[in-house]
Amino acid sequence: MFKNFGWVILFCTIIIGMLILYECKKHSRKSDSAKASFWAREARANTVRRKDISNLNYINIPDSVIPSDISDDEINEYRTTLLNLQARKILNLSGLTNTDLKEKYGVANLSALSEYDENYITLVNIIARCGARLIEIGNCSLAAVILEYGISIGTDVSRNYYMLAE
C-alpha cells in the first residue's frame, strides 16, 4: 500500500515545481513588459518640445490670508515665508509624475514646474502649521480664514479639515 506513496509525493513535488516555475516566468514577462512600456513612454516624453506654461492655473496668495499684527515669533516666521511665497510662482501638480509633466509641457519646463510644485508643498505645510498655531494662541477666526484658503487651493493636508471641524 505504501510502496507507491514515494512516487506520488515525487510526482506532486514535480507538478508543484512546474507550477511555480510557470508563475515565475509569467510574472517576469509581465514585469519586463511593464518596464519596456515605462521606458518607451519616458523616451517619448523626453522628446516633447517646450510648451507655453504662462497660462497655467497659478496660485496667488491674497494678503487677507497673511497674518499681520500678531506678536508671536512662530507666526512671524510663517508670515515671512508666506510673503516670500507670494512673490513666487506656485502650482498644484499633485498626482502628476515627472513623465506626465514632460509629456504635457516639455522637458525644458520640468525644473521650473518642479520648483513651482515645491512652492505649493511649502505653502500647504505653512498653512497647516500657521492655522494650528493661530488656534493655539486663540485667534480662531484668522485660523479659519487661512485653513479655508488652504482647502480652496486643493490642499490634501487632512489636519486642515480636522482643525476647521473643531
Language-model regions: role of each:
Residues 159-160:
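TPR alpha-solenoid repeat register
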